[in-house]
Each structure stands twice: as C-alpha cells, then as structure tokens.
Amino acid sequence: MTHPKELPFSTLQFYATAPYPCSYLDDRQARSQVATPAHLINADVYSELVKNGFRRSGIFTYRPHCDGCEACTPVRIVVDQFIPNRSQRRAQSRHSDLQTSVTKLVYLAEHYDLYLRYQAARHAGGGMDQDSREQYAQFLLQSKVNTRLVEFREDDGTLRMVSIIDVLDDGLSSVYTFYDPDEANSSYGTYNVLWQIEQARMLQIPYVYLGYWIEESPKMSYKKNFQPLEALRRGEWQVLP
C-alpha cells in the first residue's frame, strides 16, 4: 500500500480512524485512512487518490487501513479490453429500452423513496434502511469533485435505477447504485456497470473503478464477472486472475 508521503499531495493530511465494526466481514474490526482537508480535494486531486486506492462517501475521502487485514482490494475494469459474457449480453438486451438522464446532484423524493426500498430489500438491518433524508443527502448528494447523477426510467416514466458516478481523469468511479428491488433477477446492477463501461468508451477514458472487492464477500462476487479486472496490490495495478 502506497504511503501518503509518497503521493503528490503535499497540502493534504492523512489520519487513521479508531476501529469500528467491519461492514463486509463479520466479527472483524475495520479502520480507515482519511484524507483531509476536504476542501482541498478537487477533481484532479481526487483522481490521483482513486488511483491509489481511495474512495469517497459524501465529502469523506478514505481507504481501508485495517490492522492485520488487506481483504479490501481496489479494482477497476479495463474498458478497451472488456468483452461481455453471455449473461451480461442478456442483461444488456433486457434493459436496452431504459431511458437515461444524466444530471447534476439533486434531491428528489422519488429517488429517496427508491433508495429506502432498495436498502430495506437488499440490506435490511444494516442501518442504511433507516437513513433520514439528511443522511441520504450527505452520503450521495454532497461532492466536491466532478459527480453526476444518472436516472434510468421506463418509457412510461417509471424510475427503475439511480446511479452516482464520479468522472476522473482516467475513468469513471462508481460511487453507489440503487434500483427497484421488486423485480426478481432484474440484473439492473449488471446493466448499470455495462452502461458505465460504454460511457467510458464514449469519453475515451480507460477505466471504470468499482471500489473494493473482497474475495470472501458474496455481495462483491459480481465484480469478478467483468474481465479483465485489475487490482491494486502493493501499490501496483495488476490483472486479477
């Protein structure tokens, strides 16, 4: 893992949080390394931070800094080498009629309602299913970098999915996506990643950053379906077998 003093961020400071319960692996404690001050982390600086394994939640920019654990692995899709597999092609075909709208960050009650439904169905008991409007906005609608909100709707206007995406100098960073949980085996999440890959191709930027992958976490297993996938290990990006 690259040490902050080796990064070209002489105006930033980095500190480690106190331990807290890990969100991904049961019975483990996690810590984060946080980049501050937030007002100095603009789009260019954030792009470099992402290349070095950082992510953001609202204006909170961090990377894992756990004692004795390196399970969280930053991963990114190599756009110009990606070829969809059969199930991904099915997802592409199934949802190709969805209408997309790319906007700046904005609060809509319709988005918030979908977010709560998604959390209640997919992450019940995790705390986020009880998020207030203020917590939702702090998590997804506060950004000091180049961020877009993407709506996916049916022809009749029915909202199916919302995605928050950061535009970096070398790729797109998938911040968070939530979708209609009422359709079983909808493959909305897969379609969303495919959409981001196509957007990166159009923008002629080489990567789609998917955040962290944990081998032991079933919730993250879908990320390995997008090949070739690169992982940041010991400060170097390398193809993940």
UniProtKB/Swiss-Prot annotation:
Catalytic activity as recorded in UniProt: N-terminal L-glutamyl-[protein] + L-leucyl-tRNA(Leu) = N-terminal L-leucyl-L-glutamyl-[protein] + tRNA(Leu) + H(+); N-terminal L-aspartyl-[protein] + L-leucyl-tRNA(Leu) = N-terminal L-leucyl-L-aspartyl-[protein] + tRNA(Leu) + H(+)
Family matches, as InterPro entries: Acyl_CoA_acyltransferase (IPR016181), Asp_Glu_LeuTrfase (IPR017138), N-end_Aminoacyl_Trfase (IPR030700), N-end_Aminoacyl_Trfase_C (IPR007472), N-end_Aminoacyl_Trfase_N (IPR007471)
Domain of life: Bacteria
Full protein name: Aspartate/glutamate leucyltransferase
Function comment: Functions in the N-end rule pathway of protein degradation where it conjugates Leu from its aminoacyl-tRNA to the N-termini of proteins containing an N-terminal aspartate or glutamate.
Taxonomic source organism: Herminiimonas arsenicoxydans
CC terms in the record's Gene Ontology section: cytoplasm
NCBIfam families: PRK01305.1-1, PRK01305.1-3, PRK01305.2-3
Compartments in which it is found: Cytoplasm
